[in-house]
């Protein structure tokens, strides 16, 4: 994939779990070198929910050639990462709000496997949480909702956060760090976020997995709206 290309990361948490396998195959068939699989891992502690664990994500990874975009909403990612079969083709994002020792240990594990390292920031989290790790970062995931559950309304204070982050990264001379957005990424909102500087769009219930249109059609519409 091109470094600054616009990418759709399909949130499998938002898919129908009973048709997950065939939907992954459908995504592969409609890939224009601009798709990833977004895999949410939660521990019931950092967020008050449970989703996929390493066994499930490893099984999903075994049936696809698409890159995987792991989002760990957990307090101790260093205890999850060794059990996960991510590779150099994948993105692995942990949260900036966990303790420093966990972040540092996780960076070591992720970088040793050659994967891309990311930090997520919650709606109220300051960019300063990112600063100690800028030299390691490949991606920053901007949460537009409080993490934990699909289908939430966007937090209004995040509406201009991508533009602000892009400016902040430019000032720090880290222009090549990718910006991803997650939560409430509707088609209309994706267009604005793309113009503001977002590179990766997590497609969930607002933008990709819709009951009234096919997955293929949703992809076509979302693609058109993130191209600038």
Identify the function of each model-found stretch.
Residues 20, 40, 84, 140, ...:
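Conserved, mostly hydrophobic/aromatic
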Residues 94-100, 144-153, 196-218:
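Glycine-rich phosphate-binding active-site loops on the catalytic face of alpha/beta enzymes
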């Amino acid at each position: 994939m091109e470094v600054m290309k616009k990418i759709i990361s399909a949130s499998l948490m938002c898919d129908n779990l009973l048709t997950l396998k065939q939907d992954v195959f459908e995504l592969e068939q409609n890939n224009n070198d601009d798709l990833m699989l977004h895999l949410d891992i939660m521990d019931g502690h950092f967020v008050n929910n449970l989703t996929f664990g390493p066994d499930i994500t490893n099984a999903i990874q075994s049936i696809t050639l698409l890159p995987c975009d792991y989002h760990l909403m957990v307090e101790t990612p260093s205890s999850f990462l060794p059990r996960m079969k991510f590779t150099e083709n994948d993105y692995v994002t942990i949260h900036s709000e966990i303790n420093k020792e966990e972040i540092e240990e996780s960076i070591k594990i992720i970088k040793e496997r050659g994967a891309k390292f990311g930090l997520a920031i919650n709606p109220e989290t300051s960019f300063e949480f990112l600063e100690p790790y800028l030299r390691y970062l490949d991606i920053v995931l901007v949460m537009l909702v409080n993490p934990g559950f699909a289908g939430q309304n966007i937090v209004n204070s995040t509406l201009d956060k991508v533009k602000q982050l892009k400016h902040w990264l430019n000032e720090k001379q880290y222009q090549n760090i990718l910006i991803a957005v997650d939560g409430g990424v509707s088609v209309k909102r994706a267009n604005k976020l793309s113009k503001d500087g977002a590179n990766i769009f997590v497609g969930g219930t607002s933008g990709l997995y819709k009951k009234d249109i096919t997955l293929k059609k949703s992809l076509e519409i979302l693609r058109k709206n993130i191209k600038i």
